[in-house]
Each structure stands twice: as structure tokens, then as C-alpha cells.
Regions:
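Non-catalytic interaction/Regulatory regions outside core domains
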Residues: 3-158
Length: 158
């Protein structure tokens, strides 16, 4: 019986530690709203592109993909959010005063010296992440497989 009680106490202690760790994480990682991303929820599918600076070759390649597939971007309600170096954040090339570089880097856990392309769904959750540019084909296949996108396509057809 004593062994069983010790085991239960250990499990309770581990659970308390896990809850405390989650609470600390919740306090240190900005939420979607704190990072300024709530304005896109249920409206757009953001592709966040993080780069060490604006001249980063991977950033330029990802922007080229977006430009050359603009019709597909629009059809899927996509926007491109660029977080490059310490420059102001842009949405589709326009400065976004409500989006803060550091808050986005912290929210999506991307360091200042790395490249990352992150697709966020209309529900505000991360759908795809790569440390290299993502092809339009991969982005479109990922989005087109989403239940919300399928519903949108059916509604546009009917």
C-alpha cells in the first residue's frame, strides 16, 4: 500500500510540474491575438516568411513563387507576411503597423538568423512549416486538402 501511495504522489507531482510548465509557456509565447494575427483568422491563409534580412536568397525565392502564382494565392485567400531582419513587417508588400517582428518570431519560434516559411490556416493554426521556400504546388495541395477549402470550392462551383 505504501508503494502505491508513493507512486500516486509521484504521478501527482509530475502532473503539477507539467501544468506549471504549460502555464509558464503560455505566459512567454504570445498568443495569436498578441502577435497581431487575429485579423487574419477566418478571413485569410497567411504564409509567414521569416528571413535574417530582406536580401536573403530564400526570401526572394519565396516571394517570387508568390508573385508568379498570384491567381492561386487570391483563389485561396492567401496573404504573404514577411518578417525580415529588423525591418517592419509587411503584408503583401505593405507595412503592417499592427504586426510586431519580435512578437511574431517569438510566437512562431523562429530565430532572427534563420529562414522559415509557415502556412497558417484560416482557423489560426499552423498547417505547414519548412526551413526552405515552399513550392506553390505544395502550398496549394496542402490548402486544397483542408476541409474548409473543400467547402469553399463546392460553394463557388454551386
Amino acid at each position: 500500500n505504501r508503494v502505491r501511495r508513493r507512486g500516486v504522489a509521484t504521478i501527482r507531482g509530475m502532473m503539477a510540474l507539467a501544468v506549471a510548465a504549460l502555464a509558464v509557456t503560455a505566459l512567454t509565447v504570445p498568443s495569436t491575438s498578441e502577435a497581431g494575427m487575429q485579423r487574419f483568422q477566418w478571413q485569410n491563409r497567411p504564409l509567414l516568411v521569416f528571413a535574417p534580412d530582406g536580401d536573403d536568397p530564400a526570401l526572394q525565392r519565396q516571394l517570387g513563387i508568390a508573385d508568379s502564382h498570384a491567381a492561386g494565392w487570391r483563389a485561396r485567400d492567401m496573404v504573404t507576411i514577411v518578417v525580415a531582419g529588423d525591418r517592419p513587417v509587411t503584408v503583401d508588400g505593405t507595412r503592417a503597423k499592427d504586426l510586431v517582428n519580435d512578437a511574431l518570431r517569438q510566437r512562431y519560434r523562429v530565430t532572427g538568423d534563420s529562414f522559415a516559411a509557415i502556412l497558417v490556416g484560416k482557423d489560426g493554426t499552423e498547417k505547414l512549416r519548412h526551413d526552405a521556400p515552399i513550392s506553390a504546388d505544395k502550398l496549394f495541395r496542402t490548402i486544397d486538402a483542408m476541409p474548409m477549402r473543400r467547402r469553399e470550392m463546392r460553394e463557388r462551383e454551386g
